[in-house]
Amino acid sequence: MEEITFEKAMERLEEIVDLMNQPSTSLDASLKFYEEADALMRICESRIRKAEERVRELSEKRNEDFLSEEESFVH
């Protein structure tokens, strides 16, 4: 699957849910939609994990900077 933004992946997932909820959607089509949705969910989960990791890194850096500044005031 080509590079896709988190937002586009979520948008496509919503479309797939709508399509799968239609009574006219065949079993074969539903299976293909499910496979596509699975790939999209993996992309979204990966992006969320990366974002969480980055936030954690930034928070740790901010805490380190704060402690460093605090030590300089004490000495």
Curated annotation (Swiss-Prot):
Protein known as: Exodeoxyribonuclease 7 small subunit
PANTHER family given in the database record: EXODEOXYRIBONUCLEASE 7 SMALL SUBUNIT (PTHR34137:SF1)
Keyword Cytoplasm included in the entry's annotation: yes
Superkingdom classification of source: Bacteria
Family: Belongs to the XseB family.
Assembly description: Heterooligomer composed of large and small subunits.
One cellular component term from this protein's GO annotations in UniProt: exodeoxyribonuclease VII complex
Catalytic activity, EC: 3.1.11.6
Source lineage: Bacteria, Pseudomonadati, Chlamydiota, Chlamydiia, Chlamydiales
Subcellular location: Cytoplasm
Keywords: Cytoplasm, Exonuclease, Hydrolase, Nuclease
Chief location category: cytoplasm
A GO term for molecular function: exodeoxyribonuclease VII activity
Function: Bidirectionally degrades single-stranded DNA into large acid-insoluble oligonucleotides, which are then degraded further into small acid-soluble oligonucleotides.
